[in-house]
Amino acid sequence: AKNVIYEYNAENDVPVAIFMAHIDTVFPESVPLELTEKDGKWFCPAVGDDTANVALLMLMAAYVANEKPKTNGGIVFVMNSCEEGLGNLKGSHALNARYGKRIEQVISFDGYLDGIVGMAVGSLRYKVTVKTAGGHSFVDFGNVNAIERLSAIITELYQYKIPAGSAKTTFNVGTISAGTTVNSIAAQAEML
């Protein structure tokens, strides 16, 4: 993980409180992150998830570094990476590996929703691959098409009813890749 860490009074084996905000975004590197201003407000892809919180975290760290408050334990400010996409919280897992049992609390600033989540968030990422014989669209017409089979799986997934309760459960098919040419029956299709 490519975490950026600032430790304050966190030497030796003192207990630590971790404050973090993630520095990666859901946007691919090809998307320009251009800042614009309109009516006194700033707009930019990823400003709410999670750039504004990273700026807040840096201000907090600067305040602590300058004012040097007395603390009962260590404070760890982290701009963590590998939170979005296939990173699957790798930056957070690296913090757990580094600080382990020393961690007394973790506060993650993430997103811009008006609410506080007071529990850990679980996250699983799956890559589902469908393989079939495929073939030529004319000669092998009738062979099973991997795209059609994957589409059926996705349709069934989105029919799933989320259980009622206080915990939030979500799922998403974010990417699909399949096929090789317009005249071939797809032999492979995958989703993430």
Where are these regions (language model features)?
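Acidic-glycine-rich active-site phosphate/pyrophosphate-binding loop
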Residues: 24-37, 103, 118-129
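A short glycine/serine-rich beta->alpha loop
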Residues: 39-48, 134-137, 179-180
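Acidic/histidine-rich catalytic neighborhood of metal-dependent amide-processing enzymes
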Residues: 41-42, 46-125
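Acidic-enriched catalytic cores of C-N bond-cleaving enzymes acting on peptides and small amides
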Residues: 140-185
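Short alpha-helix boundary/capping segments
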Residues: 45-52, 138-146
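Short, flexible turn/loop "capping" segments at secondary-structure junctions
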Residues: 130, 184-188
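Short glycine-enriched loops at secondary-structure junctions
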Residues: 21-26, 111-114, 121-123, 176-179
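Acidic/His- and Gly-rich active-site-bordering loop/insert found
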Residues: 1-43, 63-66
